[in-house]
Amino acid sequence: MTKRELPPGLRPETLAVRTAIERSQYGENSEALYLTTGFVQPDAATSAERFASGEGYTYARTSNPTVTAFERRLAALEGTEAAIGASSGMGSILMMIMGLLKAGDHVVLSRSMFGSTLNLFAKEFGKFGVETTFVSQTNVDEWRAAMRPNTRLLFAETPTNPLTEVCDIAALAQIAHDAGALLAVDNAFATPLLQRPVEMGADIVMHSGTKYLDGQGRVMAGALCASRQLVTEKFAPVVRTAGMVLSPFNAWVVLKGMETLGVRVKAHCDNTLAIARWLETQPQVARVYYPGLPSHPQHELAMRQQNGLGGGVLSLELAGDTPEAARAKAFHLIDSCRVLSIATNLGDTKTIISHPATTSHGRLTEAQRQAAGISQGVVRLAVGLEHHEDIQDDLLRGLSTLSA
């Protein structure tokens, strides 16, 4: 069919719906799902040319039209030249490290990152000679002091999981670039509807499409967004050889989920802010961690970076005389809920309640958890799209029977 070029200057909500629509000769209005491992070539010469150049579609491990559509749409939303999909968010991190680093290279990493990310750097990459220094998410001076002549990459997520710490992306970009290094930002919590890290100087934006991009907790997906040069020369050879490819079905599910990203993210943020404000009034809650609250240490920075919104995740802390007592309170609150789901994913339409110290960060050592500020009394809420008062009522079932 004749392709109509989109006009420039479209807003993110429109890009999430209209970008990367490639209709076949049948004129389908919904993006097509190409479930195939191989692509038939018209003749041997064309087959040889495509395999040699990497252009066109030959084999599903190297490229697929549905995956390409997902990549183009995400790149448009993030404002990068290109993007490349991966089987999961963790797969995209593996792709990034394999593509950029070698033995003897050094990475500076926030110690407040997702538990699996911390484990990957602390336990796995060291086996291959990659050196890592963990620093405070919010202390720019620590990032600067950690730089070495062999530092090649700075990596942060903002806001963090689960305590929603926010880093100064522009400041970290300056530190990285002054040293000839790159800055990568995990943008899964914020999504490009709240912040676009490349506009603040980041070189690479990492995504777990499993979360808000999908939006309904259905499939695993990951991606890296960056310059065309980084994607084609550094990342694509890794993912196509190592095989952490994004399946076309998962790409299609996330592609369709992205169409409602604008309305969903705003609703998540509104719900979460209402619940965070309410939790601050509850005597049983010692502290609420949410960037949308003025009480958050990085509130002003978050509002500047995140389009004036706080995101869809908060954590609350329950105090106890001992760690065991605090954990007992947290478990009681979680087990008292009848509406909320006890799980560990986020970005879902359903509100998810979890205990990070024994789930997402359970494989960390106690010292690592303490360094990240994750106590036994911390409970994370990945707020969904239910009515916020129903979520509050569900939490009150447990809170009302706890002592302050």
Where do the PLM segments sit?
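PLP-dependent enzyme catalytic core of the Aspartate aminotransferase-like
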Residues: 2, 122, 131, 145, ...
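Conserved PLP-enzyme active-site core in the AAT-like
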Residues: 2-7, 16-22, 82-283, 289
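Conserved N-terminal alpha-helix of the aminotransferase class I/II PLP-enzyme fold
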Residues: 38-91, 116-123
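Short, well-ordered beta-strand elements within core beta-sheets of diverse protein domains
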Residues: 254-263, 311-323, 380-384
